[in-house]
Amino acid sequence: MADQIQEILDVPREFLKDGIQFIKKCQKPDRREFIKISQAVGTGFLIMGAVGYLVKLIHIPLNQVLVGGA
C-alpha cells in the first residue's frame, strides 16, 4: 500500500523536477531575435487576413449566383 502511494507521489515530483530543469535551460530572446519573431508573426497575420478576405470576396458573389438570391 505504501509503495503505491509512493509511486503516485513520485510522478508529480519527477514532472516538477524536469520542468525546473527545462526552465533553467531556457533563455529569453534578445531584442533582435524578438523583433525578427514579431515580424514573422505579423507577416503571417497579414497573409492569413488577405487570404481570408479574398476567399470571402470570391465566395459571396459565387454563393449569390449558385443560390439565386433566395
From Swiss-Prot:
NCBIfam families attached to this UniProt entry: secE_euk_arch
Keyword Membrane attached: yes
Topology, Extracellular side: 59-70
Protein name in UniProt: Probable protein transport protein Sec61 subunit gamma
GO molecular function: protein transmembrane transporter activity
Transmembrane regions listed in the UniProt entry: 40-58
Keyword Nucleotide-binding: no
Disulfide bonds: none
Record's function text: Necessary for protein translocation in the endoplasmic reticulum.
Topology in membrane: Single-pass membrane protein
Pfam families linked to this entry: SecE
Quaternary data: Heterotrimeric complex composed of SEC61-alpha, SEC61-beta and SEC61-gamma.
UniProt keywords, alphabetically: Endoplasmic reticulum, Membrane, Protein transport, Translocation, Transmembrane, Transmembrane helix, Transport
GO biological processes: post-translational protein targeting to membrane, translocation
Organism: Neurospora crassa (strain ATCC 24698 / 74-OR23-1A / CBS 708.71 / DSM 1257 / FGSC 987)
Gene3D superfamilies referenced in this protein's UniProt entry, alphabetically: Preprotein translocase SecE subunit
